């Protein structure tokens, strides 16, 4: 976003001084057309060890953003983990969903809540989530070993099954929600399940690389199967599973 058309500021949404800090940056009184709230802590496993951090950022931080800025349309990035609420991460995001829904309805503000499902894909930028599948595969390609967490699940090959989406598909959905708010929760997935073991082999094939796979115990909070059943009209399938795993750059 750093360029002639954008201004970028670094703020802590959970800081008690956030309302003061952000008003110092945005000193004008006009409303924003849309706020897209993407800031969050997202590591499922880590949330089981540091739940307070996740509730502070994902719940209190969301409340700060909601109540500090003026806007006509609010978009919340949530997660499929909010459905099962099997981890502090999932619970914190579900709480954020409810806060956004109730606040926007009370204030008569347009809103959309998007639950993302396993976003992957690359456009030449290093993945920001070091524990995500794509980042882990890129690291394995460089270092020689991929760590597979759990291979004893009740699935076709023992590894977790997920519904994968491309980051550009998610961006397209966000743009649609700017233009036409849903005023409800929408799930962003394709309803197609692919196992982690299958994704490993696809990554090796499309990127012409090889590495070892070392099995580790399953991580706390990981769902065995997470595949979407109800497909949102905001979601358009634009990439094949091979394209999802293609490393650019």
Model-derived segments and their meaning:
Residues 140, 173-218:
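Mid/C-terminal beta-alpha module of Rossmann-like enzyme folds, strongest
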Residues 8, 111, 146, 211-213:
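Generic structural signal for residues in well-ordered beta-strands
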Residues 26, 45, 52, 63, ...:
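Residues in well-ordered alpha-helical elements
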Residues 1-122:
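N-terminal Rossmann-like NAD(P)+-binding domain of SDR-like oxidoreductases, especially those catalyzing
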Residues 167, 216-243:
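Conserved C-terminal active-site "lid" loop/helix of NAD(P)H-dependent oxidoreductases
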Residues 88, 101-176, 200-204:
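NAD(P)-dependent short-chain dehydrogenase/reductase
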